[in-house]
Amino acid sequence: MPVLDNDADFTPSLGSPGSGVVITGGASGIGLAAAHALAAVGRPVALWDINAEGAAGSASIIEGRYGVRAAGLSVDLRNPQAVTPAAIETRAAIGAIGGIVHCAGTAEATGIDGVTPENWDAGLALHVRSLLLMTQAFREDLRSSPGSAIVALSSINATLGNGMIPIYSAAKGAVISLVRSMADELAGDGVRINAVSPGMIDTPIMTETKAQLPGHFERRIMLGRYGAPEELGRVIRFLMSDEASYMTGAEVVVDGGNINSQRQ
């Protein structure tokens, strides 16, 4: 029977490895919270976002606050040609890359009848295809950097479904499937990949929903409130660190007890 190694090191290692991390959707919300959480333990960060001004401003704040290298890049992940040049610029800005955190996304309320070939393709490109393209672009970097990891944001809507946002829900389900599919091959590179599925988090994407349905979601959540972006940031930081060295191909649900709640 295996026994505990009395010489095992239980010193917290949230800052290990110390390699750079690329964070999509890094100008706001969960992506920005993840950037702060990682920078706080000494990891350089590159914030990729369609909002160029927001990415640059957030990177400047992070660099000044934590004393790490930080860069803000304008990247439209719906364009497959944007990934390679952004990867080159990122390496030049923050050095060795040992992680990807994929948070970029939109949730367009279309219902079934509002789905078009154009918005369907755009949604899948942003949420799913870009994760694959970034993994391809940085695969050699990750393979060369011990302890490398990827975290991709999914959603509880991948499990529950949501009739108002079918593109988003389908894309987030695909993210989990892609994470599980890539985990096997990436393990051979020494690279871990996991998905995080948030519940109702107080981010800019939820502002309109909160205003339209005050108290609606809080009643359904065991903890009785929306989550804060920084609560997700801490979970992402854990998964990106050596603390989670035996986790890959997993979905981590962070929803305040929403999925398991029987409340109406």
Listing of model-derived features with the role each one plays in the protein:
Residues 111-112, 116-124, 217:
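Substrate-binding pocket helix/loop in short-chain dehydrogenase/reductase
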Residues 155:
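Residue(s) in the substrate-gating loop at a strand-loop-helix junction
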Residues 115, 161-169, 181, 209, ...:
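Active-site loop-to-helix junction immediately N-terminal to the catalytic Tyr of the SDR YXXXK motif
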Residues 2-13, 160, 237, 248-264:
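Short C-terminal tail/terminal secondary-structure segment
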Residues 135, 171, 179:
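Active-site helix of classical SDR
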Residues 140, 184-188, 245:
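Alpha-helical segment proximal to the catalytic Tyr-Lys
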Residues 132, 225-254, 259:
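C-terminal substrate-recognition "lid" of short-chain dehydrogenase/reductases
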